[in-house]
Regions:
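Active-site-proximal beta-strand/loop segments in catalytic clefts of secreted hydrolases
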Residues: 53, 110, 185, 240-242, ...
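Active-site neighborhood of glycoside hydrolase catalytic domains
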Residues: 260, 272-379, 385-387, 392-399
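Bacterial Sec-dependent N-terminal signal peptides
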Residues: 1-25
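Feature activates predominantly on carbohydrate-active enzymes
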Residues: 92-310, 351
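Acidic, contiguous N-terminal accessory segments
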Residues: 18-149, 357, 362-370, 377
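Flexible loop/turn segments at secondary-structure boundaries
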Residues: 58-59, 159-161, 187-191, 244-250, ...
Length: 402
């Protein structure tokens, strides 16, 4: 009997000693901060159930769909201990996670929904590249190297449907991006529906020569649905309304906010440049108090939909020639003691910054809003031009976030 027991023990020891690492390295995008690969493997056939805190069940549902779509694996949620266990650990820093793959169980620990998404994204990437339908036994400890990891979508020049936006959010989560910047308005279209101004999306998305492209915009319900879905993916959406320039589509609906009045037409990107009308008059009248009342209505509409602490208010590429010929703008210029026409935009920038801050939000603007140092320490700049490095340095020296 003793001999048999010794033989069994020796055989078990032999099996253990022969066990090797399934792989020597794993490929993740982005690279994880720390990866330790151990001997042994977890068979994917054992991944059958997920135990997750109630607050993260929608995120786990997303992962279940991702598994079915990318790896043809069918997994369900369970209230008992699953083969994948997701645990909340508030000691972990923002967006950090730990992923432990053992021979008989997988465990993800995170302190917030972003960390959960990142842990699941790493697991999904490992599953998609699995060797012989097995995952290596390993430990990953990871957190982002950069706080802002974003993607901008120009929804004004090219309309993205709700389903297309959700698919984009899926891809963003896969690569652990955390911010979607939605450019909602421009000369080409005004995509933001506002109850107080029903003609905005009617006239601001109408193209006489491209009827098939007309009438595409986002209702409040559409945007709230996108925001909610983004939240389950751990992604923040920052809305942008581009003012005081880039406003042809706005002026098509509200020409009274222009300096000269008259008829304006939204200009689809597909329209030939030679057929675009009044393109040089794409700014609102800063000397008209109605422009500021409208801007506040826009801010209120964005706050109702988007929980982000940020509102991007544009501010790029604003010529001053029309303002210089506008009696209302020049009256403002003289009344405020301005010394250059560019200060007309600076006046608008400061007013918007104060207004947005008074509503508990932070204004973001394109780099041009700080050409004459109009941005304040509470504002954030988005640098986009080729000379942005120098502008960035100057802004940072003045205590402005970039």
């Amino acid at each position: 009997m003793k001999k048999n027991l010794l033989a069994i023990a020796a055989f078990a020891l032999l099996l253990t000693s022969c066990e090797t690492k399934l792989v020597e390295k794993v490929d993740l995008i982005p690279l994880a901060e720390n990866v330790e690969i151990h001997k042994g493997a977890f068979p994917l056939s054992n991944l059958q159930s997920i135990q997750v805190p109630d607050e993260w069940k929608l995120t786990a549902d997303n992962f279940v769909k991702d598994l079915q779509k990318t790896a043809s694996l069918t997994v369900s949620l369970t209230d008992s201990e699953g083969s994948l266990v997701i645990v909340k650990d508030e000691s972990l820093s923002a967006e950090a996670y730990r992923l432990n793959i053992e021979k008989n169980r997988i465990k993800i620990e995170a302190g917030d929904i972003q960390g959960v998404n990142h842990g699941l994204a790493s697991l999904l990437q490992l599953i998609m590249t699995a060797k012989d339908a097995q995952l290596p036994v390993l430990t990953i400890q990871d957190k982002p190297a950069f706080g802002y990891r974003g993607l901008m979508l120009d929804c004004a020049r090219h309309f993205w449907t709700v389903d297309e936006l959700k698919e984009t959010l899926d891809h963003m989560a896969f690569f652990k991006l955390n911010t979607l910047h939605m450019h909602l308005t421009d000369n080409q279209a005004w995509r933001l529906s506002m109850d107080k101004y029903p003609d905005l999306v009617k006239e601001g998305t109408y193209y006489y020569d491209f009827p098939e492209l007309s009438g595409k915009y986002y209702s409040k319900e559409d945007l709230k649905e996108i925001v909610t879905y983004a939240g389950t993916r751990g992604i923040e959406i920052i809305p942008e309304v581009d003012l005081p320039g880039h406003s042809i589509a706005l002026l098509a609906a509200l020409p009274e906010l222009s300096c000269r009045g008259g008829k304006f037409e939204a200009t689809p990107e597909e329209r030939d440049w030679n057929k675009r009308k009044r393109g040089n008059e794409n700014m609102i009248c800063i000397g008209n108090p109605q422009s500021f009342a409208f801007a506040e209505d826009v801010i209120d509409a964005l706050i109702e939909i988007f929980p982000s602490q940020y509102i991007h208010f544009g501010g790029d590429e604003v010529p001053t020639d029309i303002w210089e010929e506008c009696p209302k703008c020049m009256a403002l210029y003289k009344r405020e003691g301005m010394k250059s026409p560019g200060e007309i935009q600076d006046y608008f920038t400061r007013k918007m910054s104060d207004l947005i801050r008074s509503k508990g939000k932070i204004m973001i603007g394109w780099g041009e809003i700080n050409d004459r140092h109009a941005a304040g320490p509470n504002d954030v700049l988005t640098i986009w031009r080729d000379n942005g490095v120098e502008k960035q340095k100057i802004a940072l020296e003045h205590g402005i976030s970039v």
